[in-house]
Amino acid sequence: MTLASQIASDLLDIKAVYLKPEEPFTWASGIKSPIYTDNRITLSYPETRTLIENGFVKKIKEEFPEVEVIAGTATAGIPHGAIIADKMNLPFAYIRSKPKDHGAGNQIEGRVVKGEKMVVVEDLISTGGSVLDAVAAAEREGADVIGVVAIFTYELPKAEKNFAEAGVKLVTLSNYTELIKVAKVKGYITADGLRLLKKFKENQETWQD
């Protein structure tokens, strides 16, 4: 079993991911979605957590060997980022969604040295907007962001476009395509459910038509 399929399997088993193609969820953006993900739950399962952190370390060493500092997005990327930084013996910082409105008004907590090569850790990629905002904030502080890593991506075309336009490399441990394949094999969804889930990936607006 590949890392992507093992993580997909774990996410389903611990109910970090719910699939309900026949009774869709409504995302904050208003999109009706057959999938809902809460990767924070992975922190409560040591075996899954270890699988994820070891996967991150392996991917970062392969894809970004020149990394000098790990940063997590607030709040979901913080615990994973801190564990990764510890495993790799690297400095750690975290990036707020917006600057503090008191004190020094920091958006980045931790010391970032100008020009340091940074990898940003996120738990989930939908459109990529929030993590790319974090990347921009880190770069304003002088970091050289060489990439983003995440546990899971919905593989939405908008995310692909956003990362391409930002010129930021994205590496994920698992993805939507792998997850729905594993879900069908493990009996989490029916053949008709799989069809709807594939349609959602193709077009998030018309998949229910």
Swiss-Prot record:
Pathway: Pyrimidine metabolism; UMP biosynthesis via de novo pathway; UMP from orotate: step 1/2. It comes from the Bacteria. GO terms for biological process: 'de novo' UMP biosynthetic process; pyrimidine nucleobase biosynthetic process. The keyword Transferase applies. It catalyses: orotidine 5'-phosphate + diphosphate = orotate + 5-phospho-alpha-D-ribose 1-diphosphate. Its cofactor is Mg(2+). It is an enzyme of class 2 (transferase). GO terms for molecular function: magnesium ion binding; orotate phosphoribosyltransferase activity. Belongs to the purine/pyrimidine phosphoribosyltransferase family. PyrE subfamily. This is Orotate phosphoribosyltransferase. It comes from Streptococcus thermophilus (strain ATCC BAA-250 / LMG 18311).
